[in-house]
Each structure stands twice: as structure tokens, then as C-alpha cells.
Amino acid sequence: MTSSSSFSRFDGRAQDQMRAVKITRGFTSNPAGSVLVEFGNTRVMCTASVELGVPRFKRDSGEGWLTAEYAMLPAATAERNRRESMAGKVKGRTHEISRLIGRSLRAAVDLSQLGENTIAIDCDVLQADGGTRTASITGAYVALADAIKVLQERGVVPGSPLLAPVAAVSVGLVDGNVCLDLPYEEDSRADVDLNVVMTEHGEFVEIQGTGEETTFTRAQLNDMLDYAEKGCRELVAAQKAALGI
């Protein structure tokens, strides 16, 4: 692993150490699934709502659908950001993250076993300190599991659509050193930034990687993926503990 003896992380963690992770189920009472997920100081409310019917392109297919939306509250960051709905235009970054969350969660559900029902995932960032998209995916899986349980209890879902857990984590190169689960202080100055989505079985759902300030080698990429795999294993354990499985 790439490391310098003089390097120390902003918050004192080891390079391969996650921030404190907390998953609270039943955070609100209206949705079928509702979770508050915390990665250190990053806090995201993830909900899963059930809608009868599917989009037009799925009608009469016998399959369900899962969609996702992501947003940040105005005061989620140190400097207030105007609501995108008030500005009249959703930013490209917001669309990108929404689609990422949707793709990631669809890897965790067998749509053919969902019937013609839609699960809408909403991830609202209450406080942002790096890793909001990865926290959203990790928390949303738990909300999804609760929503599917509600559907099964109501007799709406004919099968068992929930698949293996999916979790996500950030990893990057900070001053040339591989670091896991970057807070904003590290993320904002990272040489390389990676977001990795994985299943419980160690399979990749998505890898997003960018050389923000420099290029990176295959060896460094392998190191970052090793760190990400370790982080995702720990996150899956946290998901299963929250669900009592």
C-alpha cells in the first residue's frame, strides 16, 4: 500500500479505517422504509416509498421498477446552497448521483419478483462532510429491505425480490497516500477520487474514478480497490446488523 511515514489523516484515522458508521431504521413514519445513515459527520435520510404500477416502458412486463432521487438540504454545507427547485433547474451532479443510486439499488433487487410495483428511493443529505453518495447507497439498501418487507406483509409482492446487500464507499489518493472513506477536508484536496459500489459477495456494481489532480498507476488502483473492498465488507456488516440478519 502507498504510504508515507510522515503522513497523517485529517481526523487521525488509519488510512484503511472507516469513519464511525451508524444506521437508524424507522427514522420517519410515513414511508415503507426510512433510515438515517451516518458516516462520521455526513448524515443522509434515505426513504423507500411504494407506488402501485410501473413506468410506461415497464407496463405489461410483469416486472417492477426502482427509481431514485438525491438532493441536499440548503444548510447541509457550511455555506447555504439555494434549493435547486427554486432555481428552476436540477444540477447535472444531482442527476448523476440520482442515477448512480438507482443503478446501485437495482443491483440489489430482482425486478421480476417485484410484480408491477415501483419503489421510489429518496436520499436527502441533512449534513455533508464527504461521501454523501456512498452513504446514500449504503443507507438506502436498508430502507429498501424494509420497504420490501412491508410489500410482502401486505401480500403485494408475489416473490422474494431482495438480493444480497449492496454498499458503497469512497477511497482516494491524498498526498500520494491511499485513504478510505474521505471526509470533505480530504476529498476536496485528493489527487485521485474513487467511489466504489460492491455487493456482499465482493462483486462490483460500479466504479467511478477520476484523477482530480494527477494520474494514477494500476498498482495504486489495485490498492484503492483493496481498501474499498474492506470498507464495503464493514458496511455490509453494519447493514445486516441494523436489519437483524
UniProtKB/Swiss-Prot annotation:
Q: Which UniProt keywords apply?
A: Nucleotidyltransferase, RNA-binding, rRNA processing, Transferase, tRNA processing, tRNA-binding
The protein's matches in InterPro entries, at most eight in alphabetical order, are given as: ExoRNase_PH_dom1, ExoRNase_PH_dom2, ExoRNase_PH_dom2_sf, PNPase/RNase_PH_dom_sf, Ribosomal_Su5_D2-typ_SF, RNase_PH, RNase_PH_bac-type, RNase_PH_CS
Q: Name one GO biological process term.
A: rRNA processing
Reaction(s) the record says it catalyses? tRNA(n+1) + phosphate = tRNA(n) + a ribonucleoside 5'-diphosphate
Give the EC number(s) listed in the UniProt record: 2.7.7.56
Q: Where does phosphate bind?
A: R93, G131, T132, R133
Q: What class of enzyme is it?
A: transferase
Task: List the PROSITE patterns hit by this protein, alphabetically.
Answer: RIBONUCLEASE_PH
Single annotated GO MF: tRNA binding
Query: Quaternary structure?
Result: Homohexameric ring arranged as a trimer of dimers.
Protein's job: Phosphorolytic 3'-5' exoribonuclease that plays an important role in tRNA 3'-end maturation. Removes nucleotide residues following the 3'-CCA terminus of tRNAs; can also add nucleotides to the ends of RNA molecules by using nucleoside diphosphates as substrates, but this may not be physiologically important. Probably plays a role in initiation of 16S rRNA degradation (leading to ribosome degradation) during starvation.
**Record protein name field:** Ribonuclease PH
What organism does the record attribute this protein to?
Answer: Corynebacterium glutamicum (strain R)
Lineage of origin? Bacteria, Bacillati, Actinomycetota, Actinomycetes, Mycobacteriales
